[in-house]
Amino acid sequence: MAQTLQMEIPNFGNSILECLNEQRLQGLYCDVSVVVKGHAFKAHRAVLAASSSYFRDLFNSSRSAVVELPAAVQPQSFQQILTFCYTGRLSMNMGDQFLLIYTAGFLQIQEIMEKGTEFFLKVSSPSCDSQGLHPEEAPSSEPQSPVAQILGWPACSTPLPLVSRVKTEQELDSVQCTPMAKRLWDSSQKEAGGSGGNNGSRKMAKFSTPDLAPNRMPQPVSVATATAAVAVVAVGGCVSGPSMSERTSPGTSSAYTSDSPSSYHNEEDEEEDAGEEGTDEQYRQICNMYTMYSMLNVGQTVEKVEALPEQVVLESHSRIRVRQDLASLPAELINQIGNRCHPKLYDEGDPSEKLELVTGTNVYITRAQLMNCHVSAGTRHKVLLRRLLASFFDRNTLANSCGTGIRSSTNDPRRKPLDSRVLHAVKYYCQNFAPNFKESEMNAIAADMCTNARRVVRKSWLPKTKPLHLVEGDNYSSFISDTGKIEPDMMSMEHSFETASHDGEAGPSAEVLQ
C-alpha cells in the first residue's frame, strides 16, 4: 500500500487573502462594484459571497457587475467591513463600534455579530481597560484603504507576487479592534478652536466613480434576504440631514428646559452640542432595519416592556407640579429641535396612547410621557436621556443596579444590570435625536443615575435606622421574649412589695402610739 505524503503551509490562506486584498485596492481582477451612496467599492464576488450571506443570496439572483446597497448603509462603515472580509480585522474610531455591528447585521456577517458584540460593549464603556485594544501595526504591514489610494497617498503601483509577506494572525475566534490615532473630524475642530462644538456629521473623503455603469441595476431582494437579520445603522451618528445648531443665543433661554418632577438627579448646566435634523423617511428606514435586525433572535419570545405609570411628585418647595397632557408637540419646541423626535409626536393624538419607542424593540411609552420628556429636555440630549431612563426605571431599580452591566472592582456583585432591551431602545432614540451623542457618554450618564439613586435611597433609610443595641443578635431577642413571659410574675411581686412596705411604715407608728 502506497504511503501518502502530506505537506502543510501555515497561514497560506491568510497570505492568499492578503494578496487578494492588495489586488482589490489596486483594482485588479475585481468582478463587482458595490455602490454605497454614490461611492463605489471594487471587490471579488467570491470573497463577498464567502463572507456575507446577504451578498451570497444577491449574487445567486443577479449577475450584474454593479450592486447598489440601500441608502441606510454608510460608505465609511461598509469600507471597514469590506476590509474585514479580506483581512479579518476591524479598525475604527472609538464610538463607531455599534454602527459597524449594525451594518454587519444588515450584511449578515455572523462573525462580527457573534464575536464582536460583547467585545465592543466593553470597549465602549468609559471604565474599560486597555487590554482589549491592540495598537495599530506599522503602516507598511497594513493594506491601504481605497480612500487613501484615490486621494493620491503612496501605494504600490505594481501587483505584489503571491509569495508575499505573511501576517501571523491571532486566534480565529478573536476580534481585533484597533482604534485610529486620529479622527477624521478632529483637524477641523482644532482649526475652529473648539468654538463651534462637535459636528454631528461624520466627514468622509468623497471620491469619484468613473468606472460605474451609467444605468444602475436595481437591487433584487430574495425572500431569504428580506427575512434576514438586518441591523440598525443609526447608532454612532449615521443619520444624515441638514445640520442645525441646538445652541440658543446668550440672552435667550429655551422655553422647554425645565426639570422633570420625577428627576432626582443633580443636573448642572450641560453643554448643548450641534445635532442633525433627520427626516421622517430616514427615521422609518432605520426603524425598519432595526425591526429586521430583531429577527436575529429567532425562537425567542420578546416580552412587551412599558414605561412606568406617571406619578405626581412632591417637590422640595412643598408644591405639586401639574403636568399638562399635550396632544402634539408645541410649535415653538418643533422650531427648536426640528424633526428629530418620534414621528407620531408631530400629529395630534390621545395622550394615553402607547407608542413604541423604536420600531421592533417592543419597548412602549405613552405619548404624554414621551412628550413631557421632550418638553422638559428641550434641545438638551443628555437631559432627554435622563428623562427617558427615569420613565422606565424607578428609583429603587436604579439604586439596585450596576447601570449598563460593565462592572468595576468596587461594584457590589449582587447588583444586576438594567434591562438591555430598554437601554438599547433609549440609547438608539437619543442617538437619533442627537447623532453626535456617544455611546460612552450614555453609559456614563446611566451609571451616574444609578449612583445618585443609591444616595437618595440611602438617605431615606437613615431616619429608620435602629439603635445599635437593638440589633445585637439572637441572645438579646431571646432575652426579650423570656422577659415578656415573666412580666406578669414580676408585676405581682412588685405589687406585694409595695403593700409590705406600706404595712411596715404603719407598724412603727402604731407601736409608738401604744
From Swiss-Prot:
Annotated SMART domains: BEN, BTB
Location of cross-link Glycyl lysine isopeptide (Lys-Gly) (interchain with G-Cter in SUMO2): 167, 182, 304, 438, 466, 485
Pfam families registered for this protein in UniProt: BEN (PF10523), BTB (PF00651)
Keyword Phosphoprotein in annotation: yes
Task of the protein: Functions as a transcriptional repressor. Isoform 1 is a stronger transcriptional repressor than isoform 2. Seems to function as a transcriptional corepressor in neuronal cells through recruitment of HDAC3 and HDAC4. Contributes to tumor progression, and tumor cell proliferation and survival. This may be mediated at least in part through repressing transcriptional activity of GADD45GIP1. Required for recruiting the proteasome from the nucleus to the cytoplasm and dendritic spines.
PANTHER family documented for this protein: AGAP004733-PA, NUCLEUS ACCUMBENS-ASSOCIATED PROTEIN 1
Name by which UniProt lists this protein: Nucleus accumbens-associated protein 1
Organism this protein belongs to: Rattus norvegicus (Rat)
Gene for this chain: Nacc1
